[in-house]
From Swiss-Prot:
EC number: 2.7.6.1
Residues forming the catalytic site: K202
Pathway in which this enzyme or protein is active: Metabolic intermediate biosynthesis; 5-phospho-alpha-D-ribose 1-diphosphate biosynthesis; 5-phospho-alpha-D-ribose 1-diphosphate from D-ribose 5-phosphate (route I): step 1/1
Domain of life the protein comes from: Bacteria
Role description: Involved in the biosynthesis of the central metabolite phospho-alpha-D-ribosyl-1-pyrophosphate (PRPP) via the transfer of pyrophosphoryl group from ATP to 1-hydroxyl of ribose-5-phosphate (Rib-5-P).
Record has Nucleotide-binding as a keyword: yes
GO molecular function list: ATP binding; kinase activity; magnesium ion binding; ribose phosphate diphosphokinase activity
Similarity-based family: Belongs to the ribose-phosphate pyrophosphokinase family. Class I subfamily.
Organism field: Staphylococcus aureus (strain Mu50 / ATCC 700699)
Gene: prs
Protein name stated in the entry: Ribose-phosphate pyrophosphokinase
Any one Gene Ontology BP term: ribonucleoside monophosphate biosynthetic process
GO CC terms, sorted: cytoplasm; ribose phosphate diphosphokinase complex
Amino acid sequence: MLNNEYKNSSLKIFSLKGNEALAQEVADQVGIELGKCSVKRFSDGEIQINIEESIRGCDVFIIQPTSYPVNLHLMELLIMIDACKRASAATINIVVPYYGYARQDRKARSREPITAKLVANLIETAGATRMIALDLHAPQIQGFFDIPIDHLMGVPILAKHFKDDPNINPEECVVVSPDHGGVTRARKLADILKTPIAIIDKRRPRPNVAEVMNIVGEIEGRTAIIIDDIIDTAGTITLAAQALKDKGAKEVYACCTHPVLSGPAKERIENSAIKELIVTNSIHLDEDRKPSNTKELSVAGLIAQAIIRVYERESVSVLFD
């Protein structure tokens, strides 16, 4: 717990159904109770939300990742924003540990939508005044918004785990980006661990199908740490792990901020060359979707610090610079 001075303040933290455990942990760290609200569904699937305490003039923070089921959690968030606006909240700050639709950030083919921008429009129109996000798939998504965005990074949390793990010697490691788009992320982790990096040249013939083509960098005899922002069906990460072992990697670890882990991900990871998968709790992970070799790290402390700094009108940049 960070402190107790916010118990009777105008700071309010609410949780929807996306990740109640994380929201509770954040509230505990801030030192206040979660705000009282009910989230119900009518028999036809419509969502009904009621805020069960006064928030007039309050700085409200709504914690809700738009993870599976994505559309349900997104609608919950939009309805809650509207409820807060109509209840005269002073500010409506949404905390989105995982931003669904972030992978649809551009027109990859003709006649495709840019759904990440559409979601940004919906959030702004509903009435949000600020968003705190964690490891957006494409950092330029911040430019889709006209409201302030505080973009937190999960890499330092992952790096601390590897530095503290007695079974891992950073001097014998190599950080691996599973594609060219993740090089900046891999470089940041490598800079913290003071290790070299490698890049996997990957080509994706169609969605959720990946093919490893080539590895750029020295792998043989080293412990490989693959880092990505999202692991979805785990096709990319497991093919990468096998390619690294084939190139002589001593061991292979994988890590990500957002464990979407859909479809065959659990089985693929458990049957892969990955010794351990390190993820954060940005997405609630049911036990039936969690591979047996998974270790979960908490982002609650990072989010709690961001909330307090926003509430106190202090700089948030110290958390991600």
